[in-house]
């Protein structure tokens, strides 16, 4: 969608949504968070209506993150056949839109797992776009702090070692035509622009994965548009439907022109 490109940027989002919600009494804080969400939703979706749901999409997130730079998020879509794409929005992050994932014909859109950075106590919204163009959202509140400024490694050079290397893990048992699990791991520092180089004490310029495409054979599984809220060395769990021989191919690119691709042999499927 064309509306996505201008919003991927810390400065623009921060200008529109002026800072995280301050600590306050519960009712005041809830009202501030709802106001912030409405601003974000209006901007992201060009004033399209976003309806609440407890059935089309569900979000599983820790109430308190053990590591704010590596927060596991699981999205579940019980009515998966209706879902075209999902958006993951971390309301109080400097750039709230963490990822937009579009499901292709080789995907099973029942579940999606991501690791993200969370900068402060915040609502995390999951928005499902249905195939008829409607938007539905649900949210979870996560307590975390400092995830966007946490170092990606002991030094920038160390964090960039092996950049673009990929691994793919498949379920042990795969059957033709039935959903199968896969987990993609990509080495990349995903510099947020908010991290301080531990040696120079200067801020490291932003450099993050902005597009990833996963395909199986000649069909797309996932198209992923990302931003600074995806974690260092992103890990994504998803389901696909094996038909034919594959292989599974991943193409990834970042904001500094880096491009990587790799193909993976899928374990033989049984009938």
Name each model feature, range by range.
Residues 19-25:
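Sec/Tat signal peptide C-region and signal peptidase I cleavage site
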Residues 40-70, 158-179:
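N-terminal edge beta-strand
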Residues 119-123, 179, 243-247:
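Extracellular Ig-like/FN3 beta-sandwich strand-entry sites
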Residues 130-137, 253-262:
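Short acidic/polar inter-strand loop motif in beta-rich domains
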